[in-house]
Amino acid sequence: MSNENESNNLSLSDDLNAVESTGSSKDSDVIIESAASDDSSTSEANYVPEQDNLEKMILSTGIRVGTPVKTKYMVPFIIRANPEGLYILDISKTLSRIDIAAKFISRADISKVAVTSAREYGKTPVEKFCDLTHAKYILGRFMPGTFTNPALPKYMEPQIVIVTDPQADQQAVLEATRAGVPVIAICNSDNVTSKVDLVIPANNRGRKALATVYWLLAREVLKKQGVIKTDSEMKIPIEDFETKLVEEFS
């Protein structure tokens, strides 16, 4: 049974149930070694030689490295703890959830998809994702009432809300829930996901990890929108999604 909010959109529920019943996303084009395997090996069943460098680079970003704390909500997405005591997230579930999210986003009016990040390291990834897909970004402090108070100048009625961290972006999550809008969230091992409709398990604190999640999500959305047809047509490197350290202090 999923930990996600059961009041989510029917089509999102169907996509999620289809993946969880099979254990993987049938249409996912992202091939990465199983998180349960050793880092130096790849799954023989899914191994694609030309993707080897990309796979290693993605894993090197720390995308699956969680925190020393786990919540009951995130237990299904954790495979083990490493020697440093950090919980390791299941990369196969990360990728399948990115695929589900991309399918759902591609069926929406992209101009009504709101993406938020209160976290500094999430700002550039979110902005780049929105530039490519034409979703709307909300960076920094989320103004209370943005989704619930029509009198506000920046009021909007999103069809989908994507948050970088359900804790840091809790006001956006709360208002989306009140408005009956599905919430997609990047969730670390210590997050509470009771108000999240679709969890994307991943490191949501790391600069490179967040860039990687949003790059993968952007690529899959563009493919499902028909903007690009293959992975190789995604010419923008992951590095372009990273928040540069100089930006933080400028």
Q: What label would you give each PLM region?
A:
Residues R64-G66, I88-S92, F104-R107:
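Electropositive, gly/pro-rich neighborhoods at or near active sites that engage anionic ligands
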Residues A211-P237, F241-K244:
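A charged, well-structured terminal subsegment
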Residues M1-E50, S232-S250:
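Intrinsically disordered, compositionally biased charged tails
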Residues I98-S111:
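Glycine-rich phosphate/diphosphate-binding loops that line cofactor/substrate pockets in enzymes
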Residues V48-E84, A118-E127:
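Short, compositionally biased "basic patch" segments
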Residues G122, E127-L210, L217-R219, Q225:
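Long, charge-patterned amphipathic alpha-helical coiled-coil/hairpin "stalk" segments used as oligomerization
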Residues V115-S117, I186:
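P-loop/Walker A NTP-binding module and the surrounding RecA-like catalytic core of P-loop NTPases
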Residues I78-I98, T133:
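Glycine-rich phosphate-binding "P-loop"
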